[in-house]
Amino acid sequence: MISVGIIGASGYTGGELLRLLENHREVEVVSATSRQYSGVPVSRVHPHLQDTDLKFEDVGAGEIDADLVFTATPHGASMKIVPQLIERGIRVVDLSGDYRFDDTETYEEWYGIKHESPLEAVYGLPEIHREEIASADLVANPGCFPTGAILACLPLVYEKIADTFIIDSKTGVSGAGVKPTALTHYPHCSDNVIPYNVTGHRHTPEIRQELSRLNPVRLSFTPHLVPVTRGILTTAHTFLLEDLEQGEIADIFMGFYDGEPFVRVVEGIPGLSAVRGSNFCQIGCFEVDDNQRAVIVSAIDNLVKGASGQAIQNMNIMFGFREVEGLDFPGMYP
């Protein structure tokens, strides 16, 4: 049994961490922080969590006593918190973008923030970095879009049969966070599909960085906001470097992800409702046209495999628990 703290527990990702950890047999949540809701029972902010006696606390990184802390804080805030935790010997899974990049220059260019406290971190996509995650003190949890996009493209890059991708992702409104904006205001996003940051989304270099660890790639990425609460459906287009048929591509994906506990290669086209609420990524389609354009589709829940579930998966690996502990349940179809 380990003790866990959550810094920034009042948002959607913090709430998902609390929900998922309620049934984790190896974890006790000892601290859930929130400046806004200090002293307020967790169940008032997260009404589905009625079985917890936790109250939000307004405590700093120097006051939390835990074996591991999840930092579910905005970009730019984590870099001010994480070094204090690491210095005290507390292992960290950071859900912000502050530690995802190999160099601070890329972070500063795409996030527009000067990085004040660079640290060595392991990028927390278990399907690539499982061994490094196991011994890491700091794991940088991947972004939601990169998780779905990387998993959709990875086998083709590994096999050197594709090196250029056009990636289109449709995301639910919860990906924008708990604070409403003009973009996510109901009258604007309902009955609408909204492309945004069409050529300059900050998850683009994150996707490129991780795929290029295997082989150099070129890619374009465009996200769209759609009027659903949860989920990311990613469609990756690529022109194959070899002549392959649909069945051959499916075989490559099935072989590559064989044994992966949370990646499911499926027949047909994945759907958001099949993975909603779960830590699974479904990958399918694998269609090829007469120009050797291959189309791969992946589906994840942006709050689970795209955030909090993957963070717990990383924690499980770090502490030698069963990787599926607390996460081994299906989605909530329909």
From Swiss-Prot:
Q: Which UniProt keywords apply?
A: Amino-acid biosynthesis, Arginine biosynthesis, Cytoplasm, NADP, Oxidoreductase
**EC number in record:** 1.2.1.38
Q: Which CDD domains match?
A: AGPR_1_C, AGPR_1_N
Please indicate which superkingdom the organism of origin belongs to.
Archaea
Annotated Pfam families: Semialdhyde_dh (PF01118), Semialdhyde_dhC_1 (PF22698)
SUPFAM superfamilies attached here? Glyceraldehyde-3-phosphate dehydrogenase-like, C-terminal domain, NAD(P)-binding Rossmann-fold domains
Listed under GO biological process in this entry are: L-arginine biosynthetic process
Catalytic activity reads: N-acetyl-L-glutamate 5-semialdehyde + phosphate + NADP(+) = N-acetyl-L-glutamyl 5-phosphate + NADPH + H(+)
Enzyme class, top EC level, equals: oxidoreductase
Report the GO terms under cellular component: cytoplasm
Give the metabolic or biological pathway.
Amino-acid biosynthesis; L-arginine biosynthesis; N(2)-acetyl-L-ornithine from L-glutamate: step 3/4
Q: What is its main location?
A: cytoplasm
Enumerate the GO terms in the molecular function aspect.
Answer: N-acetyl-gamma-glutamyl-phosphate reductase activity; NAD binding; NADP+ binding
Q: Where is the active site?
A: 144
Where in or outside the cell it occurs: the entry states:
Cytoplasm
> Of which family is this protein a member?
Belongs to the NAGSA dehydrogenase family. Type 1 subfamily.
Q: Which NCBIfam families match?
A: argC
Q: What is this protein called?
A: N-acetyl-gamma-glutamyl-phosphate reductase
Organism of origin is Methanothermobacter thermautotrophicus (strain ATCC 29096 / DSM 1053 / JCM 10044 / NBRC 100330 / Delta H)
